[in-house]
């Protein structure tokens, strides 16, 4: 460093006073000139300044002058930072006011955010607060009101969509952070630290020449995207890391802008809507399960085997060997078909004497003839032989019991 041999503390104080007056008088246009003068003054200071003659009063004035220059410089730096922060707040506030009046701002318009989506206002708020997409309670209530008003105005209420509520909006933001990839970037490139994520998003927006959300504190960290990524990863940034971050960022922005509906096309939703049948009022909505997709083949239930035990029908028709007492009538399967034999058989019994009737007196004529003539010119059909009851007096006398014929009127 070259030094001036004629340098003294008095000349040094005079140079500082001149720089101080110019610094206070200038409006910012000559700041580079002042910086150049300070560098030249630094070069004139000899290395052996400690060996110069010391004047306590001059040294005190030099300290006071340098302190004033430092204070003014720091004040100007803070003013500049505050000015930038206020500009960002004005832009953000203007965008919020325009959002409430449903006016698309130029910044959002250039992002091609789809206004046809039901979650338009929520996605729009997500884009404006990428560094911290956690809306406050007041912002949630505003978004719910705007979404319900826009849905009713556009005519989407025709699909019987219920009004949005605050807890549903909270769940939407939770799912949006996860499904868009914001949480993935937070975990992979920001160490799951929301303050690091906020700085990373600001650096990315600055590198893309986009407006950054206002910051409540002065950010003294670097805004270089590569430096921020390298610091968050804890190692030097590689081209692969940079490409992965760019891909994840592009995927996140695409999901926030367009969602899923516009990617697959409206014809898919039209086809699904046409295939659905309108349920009857009052009927529960059918739920498709694995068992219902492939129903089992319907089979007829196994028929119960019929009982072979015949139920005997009580018949009031008396047999030929019974008495005329109706309380001792015999019920047989062969006589179940003779429903009109009561009157006819009583007439037949009155004309024939049971004690004198011998079915074998005419030989085999009665057996060979299928019918016999009864009283009143009615024909009766002979039924197969059946063993009759033996009379007690006949058994005692040694007589052979005779067979009775059951008859049925044709």
From Swiss-Prot:
Chain positions covered by the region annotation Variable domain between B alleles: 1-110
Keywords, ordered alphabetically: DNA-binding, Homeobox, Nucleus
Biased composition (Basic residues): 291-307, 375-388
InterPro entries (UniProt xref): HD, Homeodomain-like_sf, KN_HD, Ustilago_mating
Presence of keyword DNA-binding: yes
Main localisation: nucleus
Biased composition (Low complexity): 205-233
Region (Disordered): 202-239, 278-335, 374-395
Pfam families for the chain: Homeobox_KN, Ustilago_mating
Biological process (GO), any one: regulation of DNA-templated transcription
Protein name: Mating-type locus allele B1 protein
Organism of this sequence: Mycosarcoma maydis
């Amino acid at each position: 460093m070259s030094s001036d041999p004629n340098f003294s503390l008095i000349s040094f104080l005079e140079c500082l006073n001149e720089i101080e007056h110019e610094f206070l008088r200038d409006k910012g246009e000559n700041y580079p000139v002042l910086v150049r003068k300070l560098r030249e003054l630094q070069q004139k200071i000899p290395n052996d300044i400690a060996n110069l003659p010391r004047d306590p009063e001059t040294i005190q004035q030099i300290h006071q002058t340098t302190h004033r220059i430092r204070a003014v410089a720091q004040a100007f730096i803070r003013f500049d930072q505050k000015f930038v922060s206020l500009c960002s707040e004005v832009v953000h506030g203007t965008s919020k006011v325009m959002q409430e009046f449903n006016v698309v701002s130029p910044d959002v318009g250039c992002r091609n955010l789809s206004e046809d989506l039901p979650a338009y206002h929520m996605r729009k708020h997500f884009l404006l607060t990428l560094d911290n997409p956690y809306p406050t309670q007041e912002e949630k209530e505003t978004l719910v009101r705007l979404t319900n008003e826009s849905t009713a105005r556009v005519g989407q209420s025709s699909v019987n969509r219920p009004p949005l509520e605050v807890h549903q909006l909270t769940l939407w933001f939770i799912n949006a952070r996860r499904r868009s990839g914001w949480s993935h970037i937070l975990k992979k490139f920001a160490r799951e630290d929301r303050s690091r994520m906020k700085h990373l998003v600001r650096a990315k927006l600055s590198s893309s020449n986009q407006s950054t959300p206002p910051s409540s504190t002065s950010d003294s960290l670097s805004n270089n995207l590569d430096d921020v990524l390298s610091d968050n990863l804890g190692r030097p940034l590689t081209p692969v890391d940079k490409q992965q971050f760019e891909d994840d960022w592009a995927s996140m922005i695409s999901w926030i802008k367009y969602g899923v509906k516009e990617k697959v096309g409206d014809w898919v939703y039209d086809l699904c809507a046409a295939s659905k049948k309108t349920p009857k009022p009052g009927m529960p909505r059918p739920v498709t399960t694995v068992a219902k997709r492939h129903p089992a083949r319907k089979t007829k239930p196994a028929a119960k085997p019929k009982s072979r035990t015949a139920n005997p029908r009580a018949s009031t028709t008396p047999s030929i060997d019974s008495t005329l007492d109706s309380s001792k009538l015999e019920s047989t399967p062969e006589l179940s078909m003779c429903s009109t034999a009561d009157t006819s058989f009583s007439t037949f019994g009155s004309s024939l004497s049971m004690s004198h009737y011998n079915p074998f007196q005419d030989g085999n004529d009665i057996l060979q003839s299928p019918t016999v003539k009864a009283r009143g010119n009615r024909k009766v059909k002979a039924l197969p032989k059946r063993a009759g009851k033996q009379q007690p007096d006949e058994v005692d006398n040694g007589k052979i019991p005779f067979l009775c014929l059951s008859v049925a009127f044709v």
